[in-house]
């Protein structure tokens, strides 16, 4: 069996769907095929500007049959790429000829157990793995979470009726996104909210997912979770009456060994702390949330060029080293000279941006035209929520790659806001806005325009001075 298309996009996550949608806009009459491993795909909806170049959005889960007529879909799995002949083979044996190919195959969870399959260790990444988590939680009383990123941070405080042991390698929580000061802000807020049995006021809300179950019950690699994924699922354990129990956090620690107990009674976990001491815990299962590896579980007739982190190397047009083969999202690594205020993080925001850019680039190539890289790659920006608070991250928000030649200004109002400016040579290089995100557009302008802020000194964050009046 074989079929033919002009544009073939592999992957049903945000990057893949964004690429296909972008192609449908620029080449509405072209044949576009989206190849996805799961019948459930993810698309961006309710796109709302937070600043001129920064947007917040919802992630919608839907069945491929609901995608509309702008492009075709096929539920199957990529097995082999024949770049010379411009065709691919799927796991089901179908041959698909293409003119342009975009790989948006996402990432697979990094499990501390490595390639060894352990039923007591699960990685949270897609809808299927969340269902597995729910099933295990139903009979669990003690759960260990390993990791310090967004998913680990959400899980640690969202799990109910269960003892949570949270193991982090850093000296503060949520180190992927925030600094120790912001981590302390969150820690205090969560403790006090727990004591009052209330939730923090949320200024930005997203629609919750409606639960959509895939038709196929296989081990297929589904699309990554988006924001607020945990809001629509029951994350309750078997310790009834202990709903508001706070997680016990083990800082600067790692798992040394895991010993399975008999009769599926869980595991004994040995932790090693930074000072060399050891501690033993017992848990029903382990959630490994330590990031993702680029998913390149397919073969190719010509070797793809990979970066050091395992991602497919792409240039500013999202092109790989193979002719007419592009890549976008978690599976790729940006291999172009980065702009002054931008760097790559494997987030749904950049998945959307890269997917859209790949689609625009492919459409231009098909018509013999050239395009410029999208301006979103001039400034890092991400909108999310952590512990119920809206969060906006801009530029080098944690001083990334600035060495030690920068200063930080912070304004913090307990349980309300945490605002941080990163300045270098009097210029704003990055900003972190938690709770109060009204300054997002002003910060964006200050970073991009390189305005000298030295004359304003510390007053730049004085709550009695409206800096928006100065820098609109």
Swiss-Prot record:
Protein name according to UniProt: Pyridine nucleotide-disulfide oxidoreductase domain-containing protein 1
Keywords in alphabetical order: FAD, Flavoprotein, Oxidoreductase
Designated gene of the protein: Pyroxd1
Gene Ontology MF terms in the entry: NAD(P)H oxidase H2O2-forming activity
Coiled-coil portions: none
Function: Probable oxidoreductase.
Origin organism lineage: Eukaryota, Metazoa, Ecdysozoa, Arthropoda, Hexapoda
EC code(s) of this entry: 1.8.1.-
SUPFAM superfamilies reported in the protein's UniProt record: FAD/NAD(P)-binding domain
């Amino acid at each position: 069996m074989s079929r033919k298309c002009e544009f073939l996009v592999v992957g049903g996550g945000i990057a893949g769907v964004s690429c296909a949608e972008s192609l449908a806009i620029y080449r509405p009459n072209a044949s576009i095929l989206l190849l996805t491993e799961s019948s459930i795909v993810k698309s961006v909806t309710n796109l709302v500007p937070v600043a001129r170049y920064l947007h917040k959005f919802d992630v919608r889960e839907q069945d491929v049959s609901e995608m509309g007529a702008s492009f075709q879909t096929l539920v199957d799995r990529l097995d082999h790429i024949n770049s010379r002949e411009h065709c691919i083979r799927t796991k089901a044996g179908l041959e698909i000829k293409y003119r342009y190919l975009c790989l948006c195959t996402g990432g697979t969870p990094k499990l501390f157990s490595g390639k060894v399959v352990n039923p007591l260790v699960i990685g949270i990444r897609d809808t299927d793995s969340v269902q597995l988590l729910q099933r295990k939680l139903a009979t669990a009383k003690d759960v260990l979470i390993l990791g310090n990123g967004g998913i680990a941070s959400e899980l640690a405080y969202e799990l109910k009726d269960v003892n949570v042991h949270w193991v982090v390698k850093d000296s503060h929580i949520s180190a992927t996104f925030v600094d120790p000061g912001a981590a302390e802000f969150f820690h205090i807020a969560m403790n006090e909210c727990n004591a009052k049995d209330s939730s923090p006021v949320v200024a930005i809300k997203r629609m919750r997912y409606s639960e959509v179950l895939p038709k196929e019950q296989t081990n297929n690699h589904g699309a990554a979770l988006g924001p607020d994924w945990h809001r629509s699922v029951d994350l309750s354990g078997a310790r009834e009456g202990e709903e508001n129990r706070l997680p016990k956090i083990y800082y600067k620690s790692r798992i040394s060994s895991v010993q399975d107990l008999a009769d599926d009674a869980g595991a004994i976990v040995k932790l090693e702390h930074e000072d060399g001491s050891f501690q033993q815990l017992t848990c029903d299962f382990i959630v490994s949330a330590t990031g993702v590896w680029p998913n390149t579980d397919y073969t190719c007739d010509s070797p793809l060029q990979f970066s050091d982190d395992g991602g497919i190397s792409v240039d500013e047009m999202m092109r790989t080293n193979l002719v007419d083969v592009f890549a976008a999202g978690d599976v790729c690594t940006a291999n172009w000279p980065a702009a002054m205020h931008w760097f790559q993080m494997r987030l749904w925001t950049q998945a959307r941006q890269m997917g859209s850019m790949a689609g625009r680039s492919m459409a231009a190539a098909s018509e013999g035209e050239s395009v410029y890289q999208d301006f979103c790659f001039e400034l890092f920006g991400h909108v999310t929520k952590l512990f119920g608070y809206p969060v906006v991250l801009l530029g080098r928000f944690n001083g990334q790659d600035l060495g030690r030649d920068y200063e930080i200004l912070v304004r913090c109002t307990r349980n309300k806001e945490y605002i941080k400016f990163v300045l270098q040579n009097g210029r704003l290089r990055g900003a972190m806005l938690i709770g109060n995100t009204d300054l997002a557009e002003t910060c964006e302008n200050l970073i991009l325009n390189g305005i000298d802020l030295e004359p304003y000194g510390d007053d730049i964050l004085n709550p009695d001075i409206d800096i928006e009046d100065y820098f609109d």
